[in-house]
């Protein structure tokens, strides 16, 4: 599977790298970038990992990258999982801090300044949680709600690093790049946060509330229930294996959860 990067020259020293795994998000990308530009953020870059879009997403980002050097596009010749695309984008990130979020506007970009604030205050990982006061999972189809809650419960049973947090399967979070441990090549899945919880165990972790917004455009990229469960269980086993690899790391301060208001 090939990978190509297209962009103008990126900023000399971005402090924040925003990772966006994209598949057919052409309807929401213009608004997302307009909202990002309106935020009070440190110098940033956006790395868009396109996983085979056919709706004009990659053409839009390519045009954006030609005029805005903060934007970079990673193109993949074949379909891969969200986790794989995110890890490849993180490998090319240049900022000291990394934000991982969806491009469909269900993750409000206005939360990014709070992420930066908490990272600057010493957190290694900041999680946008639907389950701390002030957060909400929003309206969901019953089957998706059952799968999501089941995934959270299973993570806490099988992965000790997931137990101190309220939303271990959130897809919206930020972390210090120095905390990231590259995963084995070929690791597939959907929930990068499971691995980051292992990587950051014993380091300061914060949770901030967010409202999971209804999807305004396009279709959900969540795979079918049975396929998700199969891949997710493999992810949990791989995260447990990573935990064993890192178990000799000295323990730091206890995990702390906080709500930013």
Regions found by a protein language model. Name each.
Residues 20, 37, 43-53, 74-76:
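Short beta-strand/loop segment that forms part of the nucleotide-sugar
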Residues 27-31, 55-64:
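Acidic helix N-cap motif at the loop->helix transition within catalytic regions
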Residues 1-37:
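N-proximal low-complexity "stem/linker" segments adjacent to membrane-targeting elements
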Residues 50-59, 105:
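A conserved acidic beta->alpha catalytic loop
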Residues 76-92, 97, 109-190, 215-233:
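Acceptor/aglycone-binding surface of glycosyltransferases and processive sugar-polymer synthases
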Residues 1-16, 158-163, 185-261:
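Hydrophobic helical membrane-anchoring modules
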Residues 44-47, 58-92:
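Conserved donor nucleotide-binding strand/loop of the catalytic core
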């Amino acid at each position: 599977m090939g990978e190509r990067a297209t962009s103008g020259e990126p900023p000399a020293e971005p402090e924040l790298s925003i990772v966006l795994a994209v598949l057919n998000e052409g309807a929401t990308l213009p608004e997302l970038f307009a909202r990002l530009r309106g935020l009070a953020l440190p110098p940033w870059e956006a790395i868009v990992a396109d996983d085979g879009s056919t709706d004009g997403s990659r053409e839009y980002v390519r045009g954006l990258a030609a005029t805005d050097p903060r934007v970079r596009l990673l193109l993949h010749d074949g379909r891969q999982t969200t986790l794989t695309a995110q890890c490849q984008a993180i490998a090319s990130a240049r900022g000291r801090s990394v934000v991982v979020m969806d491009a469909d506007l269900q993750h409000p970009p206005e939360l990014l300044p709070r992420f930066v604030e908490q990272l600057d205050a010493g957190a290694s990982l900041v999680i946008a949680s639907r389950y701390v006061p002030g957060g909400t999972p929003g309206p969901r189809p019953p089957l998706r709600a059952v799968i999501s809650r089941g995934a959270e419960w299973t993570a806490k049973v099988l992965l000790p690093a997931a137990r101190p947090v309220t939303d271990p399967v959130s897809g919206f979070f930020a972390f210090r790049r120095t905390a990231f441990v590259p995963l084995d090549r070929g690791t597939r899945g959907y929930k990068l946060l499971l691995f980051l919880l292992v990587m950051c165990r014993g380091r300061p972790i914060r949770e901030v509330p967010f409202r999971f917004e209804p999807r305004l455009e396009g279709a959900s990229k969540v795979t079918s229930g049975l396929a998700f469960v199969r891949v997710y269980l493999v992810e949990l086993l791989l995260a447990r294996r990573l935990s064993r690899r890192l178990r000799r790391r000295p323990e730091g301060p206890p995990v702390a959860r906080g709500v930013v208001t």
